[in-house]
């Protein structure tokens, strides 16, 4: 009976780990992502920066019934742990490098990015730098980027 109960407790853990994958980013950070569902691929980028994607679970569980959802654990969130958190390890250029690593891990196919809040702003930044790697961008509650916001955001990131 104990073995049966243990098996029941391990099933969710084992099924989660089968969907969890990783790649090594340009700065040697291991970046994790979940791969769930089948169909056209959507890369889901959570808000923050620094916010774990768990708050979007109901969304991507629903969407994964029709699409393949790649849920990126952005650096410093989820399983993508950083040894140090500072302006060298957490900045827009590093996030863009991470998306390039994901692009390669997914077979160099154009990405459809689904960005919520900060994830949408990251989608904008990625598209501005790597437009040849983008198929579509879907924005959810994302603010627009003005020169004033860009200056504020850069200052805010540099203070971290």
Say what each PLM segment does.
Residues 1-20:
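Bacterial Sec-dependent N-terminal signal peptides
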Residues 112, 135-138:
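Residue in the alpha/beta-hydrolase core beta-strand immediately N-terminal to the catalytic nucleophile
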Residues 44-48, 117, 142:
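Glycine-rich His-Gly loop
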Residues 25-82, 86:
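Conserved HGGG/HGGXW glycine-rich cap/lid loop of the alpha/beta-hydrolase fold
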Residues 74-114:
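Active-site loop/oxyanion-hole signature of alpha/beta-hydrolase fold enzymes
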Residues 120-131, 137:
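Short glycine-enriched nucleophile-adjacent loop
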Residues 138-160:
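Flexible "cap/lid" loop of the alpha/beta hydrolase fold
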């Amino acid at each position: 009976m104990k073995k049966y109960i243990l098996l029941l407790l391990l099933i969710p853990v084992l099924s989660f780990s089968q969907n969890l994958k990783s790649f090594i980013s340009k700065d040697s950070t291991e970046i994790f992502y979940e791969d769930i569902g089948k169909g056209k691929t959507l890369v889901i980028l959570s808000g923050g920066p620094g916010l774990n994607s768990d708050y979007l679970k109901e969304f991507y569980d629903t969407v994964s019934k029709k699409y393949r959802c790649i849920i990126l654990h952005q650096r410093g969130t989820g399983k993508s742990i950083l040894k140090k958190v500072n302006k060298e390890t957490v900045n827009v250029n590093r996030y863009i490098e991470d998306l390039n690593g994901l692009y390669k891990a997914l077979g160099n196919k154009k990405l459809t990015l689904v960005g919520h809040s900060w994830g949408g702003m990251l989608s904008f930044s990625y598209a501005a730098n790597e437009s040849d790697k983008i198929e579509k961008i879907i924005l959810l509650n994302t603010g627009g980027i003005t020169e004033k916001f860009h200056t504020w955001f850069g200052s805010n990131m540099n203070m971290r």
